[in-house]
């Protein structure tokens, strides 16, 4: 199928989706949020995850690593088991599925074997929309995650929409330039409950809004989007365009990026 025709077909599918759980006889979109560690998808895009699940789409939270290095003083196998349980609990709250890709926290490798593995995974999943880390980030695992996903997107001839999420902007994500803001007010409590499921990471109401910056980011992006709380996303150039608000039935159209 020529690229222009395929691109238009994707846009038509996205524009016509707007599904709810009650319209299960209509096609659903496959949406993947791919984070480097357990808690990345939930804190960076938990609102999108919750809204997409509530709209009836097939939504999966994908973890590149299992967070083995994320609990100081705890051996890697035990830490991984704890963080897997926390991620599964968080995703149950959001109503999404989980996939763990098995890379090692703090030692993620980018090589031809991993490129092939990610490309094969995405080819098998056949997603319509993928959200992953912004490429300019102080955390090496975040950068590796972006690299692997972006390479797979190119290898798959840019078949799916590719968007980026921010992680603790200014501390981890650097120079984030959003193209879309998504009103998450309707699912804010659910997003927070999912984030707080990551007990081992010390995510509490106080730290969520304080040292981890997530609450501050939600309010700031809300100001930009002319609502109270929002998440921001950046579309990769040459990616199919998704109107996230229309797709997820969250109300007015997103405010375009500056």
Residue spans for each PLM region:
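Metal-dependent phosphohydrolase cores
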Residues: 12
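Active-site rim/loop-helix segments in enzyme catalytic domains that contact anionic ligands
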Residues: 20-125, 154-155, 246-255
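Metal-dependent de-N-acetylase/amidase catalytic core
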Residues: 6-9, 19-34, 109-258
């Amino acid at each position: 199928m020529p690229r222009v025709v395929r691109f238009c077909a994707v846009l038509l599918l996205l524009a016509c989706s707007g599904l709810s759980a009650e319209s299960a006889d209509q096609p659903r979109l496959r949406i993947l949020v791919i984070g480097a560690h357990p808690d990345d998808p939930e804190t960076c895009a938990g609102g999108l995850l919750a809204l997409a699940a509530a709209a009836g789409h097939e939504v999966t939270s994908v973890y590149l690593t299992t967070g083995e290095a994320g609990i100081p003083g705890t051996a890697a196998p035990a830490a991984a088991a704890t963080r897997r349980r926390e991620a599964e609990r968080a995703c149950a709250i959001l109503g999404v599925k989980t996939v763990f890709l098995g890379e090692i926290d703090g030692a993620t490798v980018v090589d031809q074997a991993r490129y092939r593995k990610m490309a094969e995974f995405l080819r098998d999943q056949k997603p319509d929309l993928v959200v992953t880390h912004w490429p300019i980030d102080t955390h090496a695992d975040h950068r590796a995650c972006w690299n692997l996903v972006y390479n797979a997107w190119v290898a798959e001839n840019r078949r799916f929409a590719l968007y980026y999420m921010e992680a603790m902007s200014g501390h981890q994500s650097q120079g984030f330039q959003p193209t879309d803001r998504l009103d998450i007010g309707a699912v804010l409590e659910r997003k927070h409950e999912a984030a707080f499921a990551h007990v081992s990471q010390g995510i509490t109401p106080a730290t969520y809004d304080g040292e981890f910056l997530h609450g501050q980011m939600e309010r700031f992006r809300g100001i930009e989007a002319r609502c109270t709380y929002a998440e921001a996303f950046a579309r990769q150039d040459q990616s199919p365009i998704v109107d996230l608000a229309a797709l997820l039935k969250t109300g007015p159209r997103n405010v375009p990026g500056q």
